[in-house]
Amino acid sequence: MIKQRTLKRIVQATGVGLHTGKKVTLTLRPAPANTGVIYRRTDLNPPVDFPADAKSVRDTMLCTCLVNEHDVRISTVEHLNAALAGLGIDNIVIEVNAPEIPIMDGSAAPFVYLLLDAGIDELNCAKKFVRIKETVRVEDGDKWAEFKPYNGFSLDFTIDFNHPAIDSSNQRYAMNFSADAFMRQISRARTFGFMRDIEYLQSRGLCLGGSFDCAIVVDDYRVLNEDGLRFEDEFVRHKMLDAIGDLFMCGHNIIGAFIAYKSGHALNNKLLQAVLAKQEAWEYVTFQDDAELPLAFKAPSAVLA
């Protein structure tokens, strides 16, 4: 059978919180089968757990934020969540001694390296996938996102940014998902923002960790980072990275085709909730052997080494 995955050992890293600008210690722990993805704030006494759950996503202005019934929150989970989706990690406990996951370099790559350093272990329990059975679409003005049935996981994302630094030919990205494709094509794409917005937020005591070290920063005309872009179409690739993290909030890899136009955290979450709320639109599936498994989810040697 295709088995659930967790980590082989505990790993730790430090980084800066995007919102507070303070040092954050991140600890990733293995977890037993059927635990799911658990985010934990250890700066609170007692520590507070936030299971990855589409319904817990409430605040999506600057990032994906999980909020519990007591209005306690943990922020900036989407890039780490994307790395978990990319490597197919089903069970993990993620601890931070702060109200947010560290921003690292603004991409998912540091989290991928950390997870690979921990090693991936298979558990003796069948891995559950969410398979899309019917088309589900959500809209917000001219923005939209949808899932269609597809035997794999494909993503097709279009942005519409009228900016001199973003050529019109670099505003759409499509790919057939796999762990290899995610690591090579998506994981290194960084978040981005306008210098004026960052300066305004920082003047109000927000986004205090925002810098050239953790984002692509643009003014009205150009990219301001000395090293430029990692990909010509890094902006749309990062929006796809965000979507992969947002959609993994159901705690399972999804078998289906995701298509989006100008979508963001809020609309991605709205789509996921719309799918899960429509019982006939999806089902849980497991696979007895590798031959049945869609190519998207076959583990590359780097993951299960």
From Swiss-Prot:
Protein name: UDP-3-O-acyl-N-acetylglucosamine deacetylase
Associated pathway: Glycolipid biosynthesis; lipid IV(A) biosynthesis; lipid IV(A) from (3R)-3-hydroxytetradecanoyl-[acyl-carrier-protein] and UDP-N-acetyl-alpha-D-glucosamine: step 2/6
Role summary: Catalyzes the hydrolysis of UDP-3-O-myristoyl-N-acetylglucosamine to form UDP-3-O-myristoylglucosamine and acetate, the committed step in lipid A biosynthesis.
Annotated Gene Ontology cellular component terms: membrane
Lineage: Bacteria, Pseudomonadati, Pseudomonadota, Gammaproteobacteria, Enterobacterales
Family of this protein: Belongs to the LpxC family.
Swiss-Prot/TrEMBL keywords: Hydrolase, Lipid A biosynthesis, Lipid biosynthesis, Lipid metabolism, Metal-binding, Zinc
Catalytic reaction(s) noted: a UDP-3-O-[(3R)-3-hydroxyacyl]-N-acetyl-alpha-D-glucosamine + H2O = a UDP-3-O-[(3R)-3-hydroxyacyl]-alpha-D-glucosamine + acetate
